[in-house]
């Protein structure tokens, strides 16, 4: 069993973001980090969308950004501007490639599929795995959609 200074349980968006920030801000110098993630490989498997309220280090992973939107109800449309807090979508494939490529450059960062492979007794542990309760009434938000691009929306309305 290997010993590590830090362990991140969950190598999804939250866990990898934490590891990336620690790495780029040189908080892992002379420290070891284990990332526990059961997947065999990182590949594009989702899109994360959010309101950008603070700067982040993943602008190069943003696939789409909106600075205005509309709310439509029968017989009425309200157009809103949100340039101070744009709505952004990050492509997980771009994110994974950027982050995993950077983390693998550090020989003190290791990926594991199972926590049983490491000694966690003297480690500082970050757990990003959600503890989902059975039969709770919390909102779990998912989107499924299609993005359609046209040259001019008014041509479609003729």
Where are these predicted regions, by residue range?
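A conserved beta-strand/loop capping segment in the N-terminal third of enzymes
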Residues: 50-113, 119
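Anionic group-transfer/hydrolysis microenvironments
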Residues: 7, 39, 129-130
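Nucleotide donor/acceptor-binding cores
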Residues: 4, 29-32, 123-124
């Amino acid at each position: 069993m290997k010993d590590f200074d830090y362990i991140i349980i969950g190598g999804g968006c939250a866990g990898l973001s934490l590891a990336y920030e620690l790495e780029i801000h040189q908080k892992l110098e002379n420290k070891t980090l284990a990332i526990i993630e059961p997947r065999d490989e990182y590949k594009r498997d989702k899109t994360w969308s959010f309101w950008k309220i603070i700067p982040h280090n993943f602008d190069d992973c943003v696939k789409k950004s909106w600075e205005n939107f509309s709310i439509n109800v029968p017989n009425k449309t309200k157009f809103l501007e949100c340039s101070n807090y744009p709505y952004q979508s990050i492509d997980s494939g771009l994110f994974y490639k950027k982050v995993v490529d950077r983390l693998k450059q550090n020989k003190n960062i290791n990926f594991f599929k199972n926590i049983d492979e490491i000694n966690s007794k003297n480690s500082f542990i970050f757990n990003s795995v959600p503890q989902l309760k059975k039969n709770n009434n919390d909102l779990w938000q998912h989107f499924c959609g299609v993005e359609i691009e046209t040259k001019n929306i008014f041509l479609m309305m003729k």
